[in-house]
Amino acid sequence: MDLNGKVAIVTGVSKGIGLATAQVLLARGAVVAGWGRSKPEGLQHDRFQFFECDVRHEIAVQEAFTNTQRELGQEIHVLVNNAGLGIAGPVDGFSTEDWHTMFDTNVHGLFYCTKAVLPQMKRQQLGHIVNIASIAGTTGIENMAGYCATKFAVRGFSQSIFKEVRNDGIKVTCLYPGSTQTNFFDGIPGTDAHSQMMQPEDIAGAIVYALETPFNFHIVDMEMRPLQPKKQG
């Protein structure tokens, strides 16, 4: 897809991978609708518009989608489902509230956003949905059962919907990033950021690479890890 002039929705745009993705898309000529709970700091561009949206609530997603089409036009070409969060802890000490918060954001929110854009993408017979999962969607991790469960769900959802919409000219790509330098690790005891991590810009570059492939060329899954693991102190 030639991204010049295309309209892209990026969820979780406030920081990290979402912010980096919005910036790279703008550099490629796209018009970007950034959805998030707070406006990203320092992102000013005549082709960027922020729409407040908490993806945990379907009504908020529907309102953001309606507002996006009203402000940027009916055709939506790209959806990057990036909004997500992770909470760690052993299962027997994990709060039900935290469990539901993760599923509401990582799984239900992704479903709401995808459901919103699909009718328009089907009508135009063109679109690309990129779902940001995690390495945690490919293997279990100690004290991360809830987070892993949400990302395995994203994996299954992506693989299924790809088969549903491929004949409508719509691509679905699922990314599985490894350790990335964001604030994800701030709330996880005993887990610290380290110098070997990938940067949000690395993930954003991979997203754009997948988006810019020729029409009949489709990257279904992308698994990314740092070349070198964390050095042991």
PLM segments and residue spans:
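Residue(s) in the substrate-gating loop at a strand-loop-helix junction
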Residues: 134
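Substrate-binding pocket helix/loop in short-chain dehydrogenase/reductase
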Residues: 90-91, 98-100
